[in-house]
Amino acid sequence: MKFTAACILLSATAASAFSPVARFTFSRPTTTSLHAEVTTALIKELREATGAGMMDCKKALTEFDGDIEAAADELRKKGLAKADKKASRIAAEGKIAVASAGGKTVLVEVNCETDFVAKDESFAKFADEAAAAAAAMDGDSVEALMAANGNALEDARAGLVSKIGENIQVRRVATRGSGATTTGAYVHMNRIGVLVEIEGGTEALCTDVAMHVAAMNPAYATQEDVPAADIEKERAFLTAQVEDSGKPADIVAKMVEGRLQKFLAENCLVSQTYVKTNDRTVAKLLEENGAKMIGFTRIAVGEGIEKKVDDFAAEVAAMAGGGKAAPAPKAEEPAAVAPAKADAEDSAEAHKLSVITYP
């Protein structure tokens, strides 16, 4: 039943996309003169209206002598004007891709709508191309990345949207390394990506530490990186927990400081027990390898994006023609964490988005 409904929905969407009645609205009059000049402004306007690639827009305008409406109709017929219709749909699945060049390592998050497309070969190839392009440029601007090389990546994205039929977006770029430091990366199941930057040591060591970060999700790199405001907030929280214990003030103060140190040890990377061996801290691991922590960046697919939760029970009841549906299950929520940990996560803006970069 669900498959049939999906097919009907796809058919309806496709019909509206290619309907001859549907028209795009343009800011300038269309031209009917022969051999009209195809200007950059005209190409830009057609591209913004249809979502098609730059070269496709130019070819269509050239074919129809600058008649922008005729060119738009042609792009629609060819299925190249679909990308903009997908842009408002939620894209919370995807892939984290990694690439290195010139002494730096980058992570790129590319989003799509379903995990099925996230596993598609064409989608994976596009994500890898985006990472390679990001590694070849300066900075971490998504806008600059998409506009590089004559909008090559943006055109590839629009073409992939047209081919696959889902909203696909390059969401963010993270970069580390300057050539004078050592960087490494670890990507877990294409969904969690970590960059680690150290002074001294090897790329393999960076990768091992990155694997630890992926698993343990520390909030900070070192205790020195924890903002003073966050420490005071946690101290106030811990004090409120024990101030009614009836114990003397000096004992309460010692309890608070002890719990605060435990909080810092649990939430700072170098203070955590190294997950692969459980016999030393990350700080000790770095020391044994003659390395010093500079920082890390951790990103995960879809974090910070609100996903649509389908009410399957209500859908079935509606299709059955009535009857009150049973309450739908709640949206999936993260597992409960200790109050101190939850408070720590709320205290850092970067951590709220799970794009953790320290320092």
Curated annotation (Swiss-Prot):
It is found in: Mitochondrion. SUPFAM superfamilies: Elongation factor Ts (EF-Ts), dimerisation domain, UBA-like. GO terms for molecular function: translation elongation factor activity. Keywords: Elongation factor, Mitochondrion, Protein biosynthesis. PROSITE patterns: EF_TS_1, EF_TS_2. One of its GO terms (cellular component) is mitochondrion. InterPro entries: EF-Ts_dimer_sf (IPR036402), Transl_elong_EFTs/EF1B (IPR001816), Transl_elong_EFTs/EF1B_dimer (IPR014039), Transl_elong_Ts_CS (IPR018101), UBA-like_sf (IPR009060). Its main location: mitochondrion. GO terms for biological process: translational elongation. The keyword Flavoprotein does not apply. Pfam families: EF_TS (PF00889). Residues 323-345 are annotated as: Disordered. Residues 323-341 have a biased composition (Low complexity). Transmembrane segments: none annotated. Belongs to the EF-Ts family. Associates with the EF-Tu.GDP complex and induces the exchange of GDP to GTP. It remains bound to the aminoacyl-tRNA.EF-Tu.GTP complex up to the GTP hydrolysis stage on the ribosome. This protein may be expected to contain an N-terminal transit peptide but none has been predicted. This is Elongation factor Ts 1, mitochondrial. It comes from Thalassiosira pseudonana (Marine diatom).
